[in-house]
């Protein structure tokens, strides 16, 4: 609830500022603006308001001291007067007036001279000076950097300001400079970072997340070689952050070839592992061959975890790097995990299309079955990936793997029906369905039969009496008709099929009824000269071609 209150207050302030700005632009307010100076002290300001104002570094620059706002400064007179008007008139926050008198500032002020006066003014209430002399923590420019910060820093460093003062997140000004680095303003940021480095700012000081300025320089999109070399002179090249990433991890991830080369030449640990077990080499290999060559040519022997590194390449679909490392004999793609997962199975799992095609073209075995009963095909269905499914089916998987795939697919309540139909359509064209159904083979398909009636129903086309496995799986409209195709006598006694519930009980009852009809009709026909000569199997075969109604009718006639 507190979060929502805070957000509502933020938006209220924000909208109020815009409303005031519109009012100021539509009406003549020169008499109001003249009433306010750019320098003001406000007592006991709500911290939420201070936090909000501090998020607008491009509009306002705020100095704090305890519960008071010491100073509000902006390059734009109108913006400054708007916020002062807002604090005075809208929020009714009391002020004690300016603590530096008679500056008479205008929009064309000399910033350097102005800041110098702020720091050195002899007024007894000069709280900025008191704050610096007492070594108080402040976030006035440590947390929120504006265009004029370089001038602030130069003056304050010359007056003994502690250059590595921390904010509430443990960040120094050097941290913040790198956090907020903008390419569009790189010249200003580069100048400030050099000032801080040349004045001894600690490049190994960690914030609350374990980031040092040097780690941040490696992590962020800053490609200034001069700054990197200055930092490198005093930095711990193997320092780690909260996730145990080193500078070499980050420059490898960012594909900063020159920085990687410098760190390796300085002896950075190429086998350092982060908390996820990844080394800098793993981070670099996804970007291409140049970084791979750089690592392989280093004097230190690389620690290679084959399964880990191949899977890493698969996740990023880095085919070029995979091919190069295979050609150098660094990795082997023919691994199997304890779950019987292969590199091809991993490529399907991570939707790495290019890698999958590459591995299949190398005659990789994709007919693997994991310990949980999954296959590459069932995994493609689970990922709803039609393109990968088409690639796998184009490689002509066997009947065994297709049946196992469909069983695995239908074990899940939710699956892509269209992809399952692709499997059925492919399997229906195969010629391996010559065996008549019996109890044992029925057990093999029970999960499939039970869970995909809709898909089966679409494939039904014929009602041949002696059903094969193909006809049972793909041509039956309803499970109740199973009783017409149970060729094995013990099917009637198969109690394990009770998983089907009432349907199976009805099937068994129907089969018993049909068996009784056939038996009775056969006995009725036995007195005939020719019928009694037939073996019982032939009698049964002939009578089985009649449906239940026909059998009942013949019995009545006889």
Swiss-Prot record:
Pfam families: Ank_2, PRANC. The keyword Repeat applies. Keywords: ANK repeat, Late protein, Repeat. ANK repeats lie at residues 65-95, 169-205, 209-239, 243-272, 276-304, 339-368, 372-401. Belongs to the orthopoxvirus OPG189 protein family. PANTHER family: ANKYRIN REPEAT AND PROTEIN KINASE DOMAIN-CONTAINING PROTEIN, ANKYRIN REPEAT-CONTAINING PROTEIN-RELATED. Contributes to viral release without involving rearrangement of host actin. This is Ankyrin repeat protein OPG189. It comes from Vaccinia virus (strain Western Reserve). The gene is OPG189.
């Amino acid at each position: 609830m507190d979060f929502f209150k805070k957000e509502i207050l933020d938006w209220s302030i924000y909208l109020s500022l815009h409303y005031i700005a519109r009012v100021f632009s539509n009406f003549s307010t020169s008499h109001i603006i003249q009433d306010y100076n750019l320098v003001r002290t406000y007592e006991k300001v709500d911290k939420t308001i201070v936090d909000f104002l501090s998020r607008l570094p491009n509009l306002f620059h705020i100095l704090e001291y305890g519960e008071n706002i010491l100073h509000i400064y902006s390059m734009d007179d109108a913006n400054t007067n708007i916020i002062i008007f807002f604090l005075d008139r809208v929020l009714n926050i009391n002020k004690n007036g300016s603590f530096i008198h008679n500056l008479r500032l205008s929009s064309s002020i000399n910033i350097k001279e102005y800041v110098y006066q702020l720091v050195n003014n002899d007024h007894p209430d000069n709280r900025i000076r008191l704050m610096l002399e007492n070594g108080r923590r402040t976030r006035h420019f440590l947390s929120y950097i504006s265009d004029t910060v370089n001038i602030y820093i130069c003056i304050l460093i010359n007056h003994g300001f502690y250059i590595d003062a921390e904010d509430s997140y443990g960040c120094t000004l050097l941290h913040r400079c790198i956090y907020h680095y903008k390419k569009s303003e790189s010249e200003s940021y580069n100048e400030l970072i050099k000032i801080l480095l040349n004045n001894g700012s600690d490049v190994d000081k960690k914030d609350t997340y374990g980031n040092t300025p040097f780690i941040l320089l490696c992590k962020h999109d800053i490609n200034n070689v001069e700054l990197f070399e200055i930092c490198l002179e005093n930095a711990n090249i193997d320092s780690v952050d909260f996730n145990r990433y080193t500078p070499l991890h980050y420059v490898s991830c960012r594909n900063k070839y020159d920085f990687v080369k410098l760190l390796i030449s300085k002896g950075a640990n190429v086998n350092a592992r982060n908390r996820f077990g990844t080394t800098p080499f793993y981070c670099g290999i996804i970007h291409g061959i140049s970084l791979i060559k750089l690592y392989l040519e280093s004097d230190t022997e690389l620690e290679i975890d084959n399964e880990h590194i191949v899977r890493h390449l698969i996740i990023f679909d880095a085919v070029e790097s995979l091919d190069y490392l295979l050609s150098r004999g660094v990795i082997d793609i023919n691994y199997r995990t304890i779950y019987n997962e292969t590199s091809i199975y991993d490529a399907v799992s991570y939707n790495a299309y290019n890698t999958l095609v590459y591995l299949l073209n190398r005659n990789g075995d994709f007919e693997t079955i994991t310990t949980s009963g999954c296959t590459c095909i069932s995994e493609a269905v689970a990922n709803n990936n039609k393109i990968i499914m088409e690639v796998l089916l184009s490689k002509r998987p066997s009947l065994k793997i297709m049946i196992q795939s469909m069983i695995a697919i239908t074990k899940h309540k939710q699956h892509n029906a269209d992809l399952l139909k692709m499997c059925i359509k492919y399997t229906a064209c195969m010629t391996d369905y010559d065996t008549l159904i019996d109890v044992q083979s029925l057990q093999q398909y029970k999960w499939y039969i039970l869970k995909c009636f809709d898909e089966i129903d679409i494939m039904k086309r014929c009602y041949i009496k002696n059903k094969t496995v193909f006809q049972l799986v793909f041509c039956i409209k309803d499970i109740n008709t199973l009783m017409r195709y149970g060729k094995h006598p013990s099917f009637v006694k198969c109690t394990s099929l009770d998983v089907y519930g009432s349907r199976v009980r009805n099937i068994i009852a129907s089969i018993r009824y049909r068996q009784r009809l056939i038996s009775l009709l056969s006995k009725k026909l036995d007195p005939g000269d020719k019928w009694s000569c037939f073996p019982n199997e032939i009698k049964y075969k002939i009578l089985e071609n009649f449906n239940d109604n026909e059998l009942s009718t013949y019995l009545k006639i006889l």
